[in-house]
């Protein structure tokens, strides 16, 4: 794994850390940081909020609110849109300050939009 992956993982994890006190921290390891809400989904499992996972080829940032509320992506910056894989995953080998700012704002909007299910 490239050394940049460690730095990228730490930066992405720091986006999620402020939300942890209102969530369930499922994983907090050097490779995986995962937050669930306190709400149970129809399948009986907790509803995911967000996660960061370090893989072999990239570091992934998952943000479930954009899956539930796709209109949150309407004004997404092109440099972040290029990083998307699927409906709620962003992949990075490295990340710059502009991308970090965009993800911070998107995460904040996702949290605010889903506040009713996040705080249950």
For each of these PLM feature ranges, what is it?
Residues 1-120:
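Charge-dense, helix-prone N-terminal extensions
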């Amino acid at each position: 794994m490239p050394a940049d992956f460690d730095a990228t993982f730490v930066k992405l994890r720091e986006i999620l850390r402020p939300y942890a006190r209102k969530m369930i921290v499922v994983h907090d390891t050097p490779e995986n940081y995962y937050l669930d809400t306190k709400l149970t989904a129809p399948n009986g499992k907790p509803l995911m909020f967000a996660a960061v996972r370090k893989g072999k080829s990239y570091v992934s940032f998952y943000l479930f609110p954009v899956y539930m509320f796709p209109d949150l992506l309407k004004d997404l910056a092109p440099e972040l849109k290029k990083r998307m894989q699927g409906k709620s995953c962003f992949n990075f080998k490295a990340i710059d300050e502009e991308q970090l700012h965009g993800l911070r704002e998107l995460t904040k909007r996702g949290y605010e939009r889903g506040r009713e299910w996040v705080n249950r």
